Amino acid sequence: MEGIIAWWARNPVAANLLMAGIMLGGVLGFISMEREAFPGFNIKQVQIEVIWPGAAPQEVEEQVVMRIEEALTDLDSVRRISATASEGYGRVDVAAYSYVDINAFVNDVKNRVDAVNGLPRDIEKPQVKRTEYRDEMIRVALHGNVSEKALTRLAQDLRDQIAALPYVSIVNLYGTRREEVTVELSEASMRSFGVSFAEVAQAIRSSSINLSSGQVRTATGDIRLRARNLADSQADFENIIVRQTAGGATVRVGDLATVVDGFEENKILTTMNGQPAVLLDLLATDNMQVVKASEAVKTWLAQTRPTLPQGVNLTLWFDTAEIYKSRMSTIGDSAYMGLLLVFLVLILSLRPKVALWVTAGIAVAFIGTFSLLPANDVSLNVMSTFAFLLVLGIVVDDAIVVGESIHLHAQRHGGGTEAAIAGASAVSKPVIFAVITTMIAFAPWFFLDVEGGHMTEQFSIVITVALTISLIEAFLILPAHLRHLKPRENLRGLSLWQRRIEHSIMHFADTYYRRILHWTARRRYLTSSIFIGAFIVSVGIFSAGWVKFSFFPEIQNQQIYINVMLPNGTPYSRSLEVLDQLQRAELQLIEEVGSGSTGESEKLIQGWYARASRDSVIAIVRLTPQEQRTMSAREVAQRLQDLVGDIPDADEIEVNYTINRRGPAITYMLRHRDMGMLRAASGELQSKLRSYEGAYYVRDSLRGESDEIHLKLLPGATRLGINLAQVSQQVRQAYYGEEVQRLPRENGDVKVMVKYPRALRESNSSLNDYRVRTADGRELPMLSVVASEVNNGVQRIQRRDVDRMVSVTAEADVDQARDIYTELER
């Protein structure tokens, strides 16, 4: 090592070029780094989605999910298989080990799924793709008192405009419904004309078409033959001929049905500050530049607002660039203050030149670290910059130890290049081994094979690179800069004060510290016992919960999310009642704060976004900046929870006021093949959780039970020329509907559904009047050929590694959640 140090110390030009190269690489790396508030959640997982319209959860589980699981169980590199079966939908998530090539894994899974035999005929083609978790970057709200269709079409146009902006590519819409053309057949009209449901559906399929029929090759050129009769409006569908009699009379769709060119039936109410609204969510991209993306969006907003229709406005609702800039400003100020303090402390006992070059060496080490981070997939975010602060002390120690050693040798041996070489060489072994042990301490984070391991991996990369660059700077560059040190003579001014401070420190070390050191060395067993005892006491204090620990401490957001999941089949009116309950809590909170502090109510909440559908209610409360309010986000969230109270029929209630939290505070997963045993275990665990004072919103993932009407063919029905498959098909057509085609429109395909009127489909009594048609055209009351029985069914089935699974969740404060976990595991 001494030879390497000597060469660089004797070649200062090379040392300076090395320093310049490190700094240049650092600057270029800093410029090219991705910038985001928090690192992306990278996971090697494949998701398989299957849509089976109208199917019950048990059917989806048995005929779709289990067959896909069976095909994937023996696939190499599969770490975990999770699945969910709900009404009309099945999803299988296949997680791979961290060392697996994800692209090859996706292809392997896709090949296995494509080879599965026996899947139901009427399912949509399984969609296989890599799971991607993308954080929200910016959220823009489009709101105004206009019709739903006008607001949706405008939002779709604006989405395309935003997606074309630089540093933006993924934009999702929330608060909209899919467009749908519905042909609502009248049972009375079909009976009067003698037309069946299937006849109408087939007429639309065969008449509403665009079809290429080849071409005529003439002497003057080819002429294409095309049938262009695709219906695309209400009038087009109403004019489709269903039947034409021998006398020339025609029966058209308009004679039998009401055509509605609107939206799918799932009602949804989306508002912002009381106005109809649509949210445009800008998601994180692969090359994240959150600040530049924010600037581009703000410029676009300023240009677009004047062009909007009257009464419609765009509001920047959420911007992670503000969080990023705030955190970076705090960390940057801490770094600058730290370097200044290091310089001031060093200059108390070391020469200004030594203090300056040592401080500069620390800065060079940190700047140089940026040169290697982009190549290691590390972005500039709160986590990576915190790693810089974490390693700051060790980097400072390296530079100070080497610089002080060179300074000491210059004082004792006359200075010059040889003193610089000797000083650096004298401490090379302890410094290098200290750095290596630190690298080893953080090395396990490289190999964490867990979800989210990419986040902790950034700590190890930053620390390892920073320490490596600091060693290069301390032993290859710093000696060349301090080779001109000479022994100080004729001390005066600052030099005299530095000598006095140095003598004071040495006097303390030679007297008080030396005495303590000798005393402890002579009583080594007592000394060891004291430190072992202190260690045991420290562990005990931590284990008892007196000292709280959180690997990822909560970072409060400027928004509070309230998410209420209701059972499938919940009436839309009930969702509106829950939404009203949340809004009343908000108004009561504003009133409370306003009565306690004059004018404070206007400063607490900036806006309120709400979305209600049949099975979920979401509210987002936007708070004013922290410096403009007296209550923290946590206090506001806790008070809102108290004011809202419990919602007994809700399957899940979540109130989140942090940026970096995902999911409930407490989660337990129970696995077994017997659903009855899972229900019993879940109930027992929920009762236990409810006994803790700090736990609330205790739920499981079963989402209660739903009523089902089971149909069974009566004896003798087959003699009438009818079977259960025919009855089921006709009932499905009547109550679920039949998709006859999809219309290509500007913003995506639009389903064309043939079904019975909504009023009929929302009444149980309609089953008593429903008639099924036999193959020879006869109509029979449905209940004359089938028996109906009401049974209980599940709303959702979760599976993990071929077993059924139930998740039990609860909300609690971070500290209370840890205590509850600890007590339950005893």
Question: Where does each model-flagged region fall?
Answer:
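Surface-exposed amphipathic alpha-helical segments in non-transmembrane regions
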Residues: 16, 23-32, 63-80, 93-179, ...
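Solvent-exposed, charged amphipathic helical/linker segments at domain boundaries
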Residues: 182, 706-713
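Hydrophobic regular secondary-structure detector
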Residues: 1-108, 112, 116, 267-627, ...
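PDZ/PDZ-like domain micro-motif
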Residues: 189-191, 265, 570-571, 575, ...
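Alpha-helical scaffold elements that line and support the substrate/ligand-binding pocket
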Residues: 180-182, 190, 400
